[in-house]
Amino acid sequence: MGGKSANKAGYFDKLKGLLEDYRSIFIVSVDNVSSQQMHEIRQSLRGEAVVLMGKNTMVRRALKTFVADTPEYERLLPFVKGNVGFVFTNGDLKEVRDKILANKVAAPARAGAIAPADVWIPAGNTGMEPGKTSFFQALGVPTKIARGTIEITTDLKLVEAGAKVGPSEATLLNMLNISPFTYGMGIAQVYDQGNTFPSDVLDISEEQLLKAFSTAITTIASLSLALNFPTLPSVIHSVVNAYKKVLAVAIETEISWPEIEELKDRIANPEAYASAAPAASTEAAPAAGKAEEKEEEKEESDEDDGGFGGLFD
């Protein structure tokens, strides 16, 4: 009993220390993960993350003990079920997640195992003798005899995802040397600084977040303006619209304040605020006319000289 109590206390201390040292946790499923595979995963995460396994009852008991001081840990409790473990990290969550999921190994089908994905048998020659045709026929696999061997004529879905693999299906897959399953750690949930979320949230880019945020703000502002219900996104639009109405009323009435006087004057005397460009062009016109007159006089002078100058050569 003393040894068990010591082990329990040691596990509690280790879990508490990891919770305090690391801000993020991957809750991972380890169904069908071998000890060798677990060792390889620990090696790949060395320096970036720490893997901790433990009995669910002990983990839940420890977390409930820590909840009094840190209520956020209660969010971990619903996910401590089945064959799970914790991966603690302070690193980039997406990079650590990819390393966790990268370690996969192919595995043969076992009778009674739940298929994690659809299992297909491809069309082609099996190299098996015709005497085993009845075995294929019993499973509904379309075959024919070609060059003295059994040939599967079309691709066939043998087992659907989520279904149990039967003894006959497992035997056939092993006969064909097909290892249809891949096993490795899966990620049940991510805990980061008090929040829990699915791992696919890590694939959302900053651009997607900004676009969604902008769309939401626009929608809220539109609804608020339509319902005449002020909200933070709509207030600026409400103020602008209200100011436009005030300006319209002030222009049509004697209401006045310093800022509106210039606007009223512009409306009453538009010519006073006309651009200086037309005036400048008007001034330029006489100057151009004078230049043309001078040019014409010069040409006439040249013609006169050319007409009589030849007589004195």
From Swiss-Prot:
Q: What Gene Ontology terms describe what this protein does at the molecular function level?
A: large ribosomal subunit rRNA binding; structural constituent of ribosome
Q: Where is the composition biased (Acidic residues)?
A: 294-306
- Low complexity compositional bias, start-end: 274-289
Protein's cellular compartments: Cytoplasm
Ranges where the record places region Disordered? 274-313
Residues with the modification Phosphoserine, per the entry, are S301
Sorted keywords for this record are:
Cytoplasm, Phosphoprotein, Ribonucleoprotein, Ribosomal protein
Which Gene3D superfamilies does UniProt cross-reference here? 3.30.70.1730, 3.90.105.20
Q: Which domain of life is it from?
A: Eukaryota
Q: Name one Pfam family in it.
A: RL10P_insert
Post-translationally, this protein is described as follows, namely: Phosphorylated.
Q: Which is a GO BP term held by this UniProt record?
A: ribosomal large subunit assembly
What InterPro entries does the entry give? Ribosomal_protein_uL10 (IPR050323), Ribosomal_uL10 (IPR001790), Ribosomal_uL10-like_insert (IPR040637), Ribosomal_uL10-like_insert_sf (IPR043164), Ribosomal_uL10-like_sf (IPR043141), uL10_eukaryotes (IPR030670)
Q: Name one GO cellular component term.
A: cytosolic large ribosomal subunit
**Assembly with partners or alone:** Component of the large ribosomal subunit (LSU). Mature N.crassa ribosomes consist of a small (40S) and a large (60S) subunit. The 40S small subunit contains 1 molecule of ribosomal RNA (18S rRNA) and at least 32 different proteins. The large 60S subunit contains 3 rRNA molecules (26S, 5.8S and 5S rRNA) and at least 42 different proteins. The acidic ribosomal P-proteins form the stalk structure of the 60S subunit. They are organized as a pentameric complex in which uL10/P0 interacts with 2 heterodimers of P1 and P2 proteins. uL10 directly interacts with 28S rRNA.
Q: Belongs to which family?
A: Belongs to the universal ribosomal protein uL10 family.
Q: What does this protein do?
A: Component of the ribosome, a large ribonucleoprotein complex responsible for the synthesis of proteins in the cell. The small ribosomal subunit (SSU) binds messenger RNAs (mRNAs) and translates the encoded message by selecting cognate aminoacyl-transfer RNA (tRNA) molecules. The large subunit (LSU) contains the ribosomal catalytic site termed the peptidyl transferase center (PTC), which catalyzes the formation of peptide bonds, thereby polymerizing the amino acids delivered by tRNAs into a polypeptide chain.
Q: What is this protein called?
A: Large ribosomal subunit protein uL10
- List the source organism: Neurospora crassa (strain ATCC 24698 / 74-OR23-1A / CBS 708.71 / DSM 1257 / FGSC 987)
